Amino acid sequence: PASAVSASVAADLVARAVSERPSACAAHFVFANNRLLHAETPALPEGAVCVPIAEALASHPDLLRPHFLRHVDFLGGDKFAALHAASTLSGIFVHFPKGCVSTDPVIVHHFVGGDGAAVFPHTLVVAGEQASVSVFDLFESIDGDEETLIVGMTDLDADHGGRIQYAGLQDLSDKGAKHVQLQHTRAGRDAAVKVGFVNLGAEWVRNESINRMVDKGADCQIFSANLANDVQEYDQRTLQSHEAQHTTSDLLFKNALYDGSRTIFSGLIQVQPGSHHTDSYQTCRNLLGSDEAEANSMPGLEIDADQVKCSHGSTSGTISDEEIFYLRARGIPAEDARKMISLGFLHEAVEKLDGEPLQDFLFARVERKFAAIG
């Protein structure tokens, strides 16, 4: 459903991706319309596997098959998951075995273009015992206002003491592009997984994030910063499932909305029977930059265990006149003042991710989006 790009376009996309990548990297892959355009592994640790999904099916089937397309639970996105499973052609398999550690991220660019183009990238990350890996996905449009569709899936599996950080940036065209991202986490004993999403583009977005803490000491942190304007709609569904004693999780979603944009947040903390001594937190905060913007939040709790500490909540508000007055008194125009306050509002979520180069890259994209908002 997506045509290959020309050689000249491919060269331009690779040059763009390499020049814009946020930091030194363990590996870098560039896909356009499901085709692999570029691959390099300048600092991949010994023993690590980092290859396209299609290659992994042939070269590392024993490592891939226990994890690939194994999830059957979704938060309403079952039909998208079935479409993805039937159509996925691109994406990356990252496997860090026991004790394998890298401080540099694996960076994957996914470009889509051509009217009616659809791509189905899959990111599968496995961290063995005491391994540590970071992966950064970027989703971008090749051209302008074309009708395109991305249905992606991200699966994260951290074994005993494993560490995974996953960040996803969606910066597609806000005219015609639609993006669905279905993410699953399985955190084992004493494992730590950190997941971050930044949504800036696309006309319509559906994010589902299911995070399961399945053994003692597991921890998941989930963060999202979203900037919507015009008629963009961001639909976010989350599940924090505590399935063992002494597990922890923390979720922070922040949405800044302008014009007639709309966000939906539906999140659930679920503490399974016997999962005592759980600590879990869920917060969604919405900043409304116009009277027409609409933010809908539905946080929830289901607790079937004793001796737990859980909280959930959501707030929605506008920028106060006092804040604007304070900045205007210091020579800052009112519109610039509003953008500064909104930038600071979103920064709290972005800075939760590890790695200053990654934070700087994401925040620069947020600033670029603000500059484009009239």
Q: Model-predicted segments: where are they?
A:
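Short, Gly/Pro- and small/polar-rich lid/capping loops
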Residues: 1-34
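Conserved beta-strand/loop scaffold segments within soluble protein domains that form the structured core
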Residues: 39-49, 53-332, 346, 350-374
